[in-house]
Regions:
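Conserved catalytic SET/PR domain of SAM-dependent protein methyltransferases, capturing the structural core
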Residues: 1-94
Length: 94
């Protein structure tokens, strides 16, 4: 098995929101799980590229869903090719 930091449907590029961001390279359906954003190991949080490059927006198109010691990124809206993926930043537990 080969580790891929991002699914084929995403890329990292310059964002008008802040610095770099995650962008869709193809249309992504509402309700799609995109991968792991964070992993909790021995009280330390490891952040993946999905967790590190997604920018904040008050009206986001993604949410983070915790399952056990991992958090997953899920779309909550249809995301069109070229559109930036966003998340509403909150204080959370992994």
């Amino acid at each position: 098995m080969t580790y891929k930091p991002l699914p084929d449907s995403l890329t990292i590029k310059s964002s008008s929101i802040n610095g770099l961001g995650l962008f869709a390279t193809q249309d992504i359906k509402d309700g799609t799980q995109l991968g792991i954003t964070h992993i909790l190991i021995n009280d330390e949080i490891i952040r993946s590229p999905l967790g590190g490059f997604i920018n904040h927006q008050d009206n986001p198109n993604c949410v983070r869903i915790p399952v056990g010691n991992k958090s997953y990124l899920h779309t909550i809206k249809q995301i069109n090719q070229g559109e930036e993926l966003t998340l509403k930043y909150t204080i959370y537990k992994v």
